[in-house]
Amino acid sequence: MKIKALSKLKPEEGIWMTEVEKPEMGHNDLLIRIKKTAICGTDVHIYNWDEWSQNTIPVPMVVGHEYVGEVVGIGQEVRGFEIGDRVSGEGHITCGHCRNCRGGRTHLCRNTTGVGVNRTGAFSEFLVIPAFNAFKIPAEISDDLASIFDPFGNAVHTALSFDLVGEDVLITGAGPIGIMAAAVAKHVGARHVVITDVNEYRLDLARQMGVTRAVNVMEEKLEDVMSDLGMTEGFDVGLEMSGNPSAFNSMLTNMNHGGKISLLGIPPSDMAVDWNQVIFKGLVIKGIYGREMFETWYKMASLIQSGLDLTPIITHHYKVDDFQKGFDMMRSGMSGKVILDWE
């Protein structure tokens, strides 16, 4: 049976609507009928066919990894799921037999493959994933929010890596993940949450999500903002979401001694770092990849159930046939999360 899917068909800029064979389910898998998908920054990289994509993405391949859907098929070895369950899923498929997998640190599996990165993705009418990777969505969480659990998970994993209660938090990069991380920090009890960027549209989104200050670094000095807030000792926790070298070095300059930094943004491999700041301030830097399985997922659901409101971050909806408009909007930088409706 042929189904609709968005695929990377050619090694050049673009993504194409295609017909592909419906995926086949194994004994340990779930077959999911996709309801909504969201466009990730990774999908934009794949669309643009940048250096990372050229080195990573097999062509042709169905792309996409942010989704919510309904279980319509269950492998014979699977327990704990029923037809009709509403699910999203962990996009990192892990091996189960390396040291980290067996030690319960699944997110650090050295043999990880990615849905929509190096195996068939979710921008399709149907998706097959191992049942281990599926996460049931509580009834009170909307399809829209469930479809962005993957990037929300990046935000939660990054933000909750260190204690935030009563701390002053600096977030560099007001993309959707940075803004969600800021909202999480505020929700769990940080004191001042300051986010920096140069994109005024996204800084406005951050203001809607309740940050203490959203700072356009082209127009305002971080030091002046800290002074306005009565901060005398620098930031306690830094969340680097931009991959921008000047943003990271500004973070190092403005951290308190003993500060802690979570690093999610991917900088150029040859980024110059002022290591004196790291060494003499005794900074702790932690690299973040993906989500902790499945601690981050439980935290995500609980945060929303306890009143965290992410709805402002979802700014655009399109029918999947209008996917090109969705990608154009994401590439413009004048959007939060963009959702494609498959129903």
Curated annotation (Swiss-Prot):
It is found in: Cytoplasm. Its main location: cytoplasm. Keywords: Cytoplasm, Metal-binding, NAD, Oxidoreductase, Zinc. Catalyzes the NAD(+)-dependent oxidation of L-threonine to 2-amino-3-ketobutyrate. It comes from Vibrio atlanticus (strain LGP32). Homotetramer. GO terms for molecular function: L-threonine 3-dehydrogenase activity; zinc ion binding. This is L-threonine 3-dehydrogenase. Its cofactor is Zn(2+). SMART domains: PKS_ER. The lineage of its organism: Bacteria, Pseudomonadati, Pseudomonadota, Gammaproteobacteria, Vibrionales. One of its GO terms (cellular component) is cytoplasm. The keyword Metal-binding applies. Zn(2+) 2 binds at C95, C98, C101, C109. The active site is at T42, H45. Zn(2+) 1 binds at C40, H65, E66.
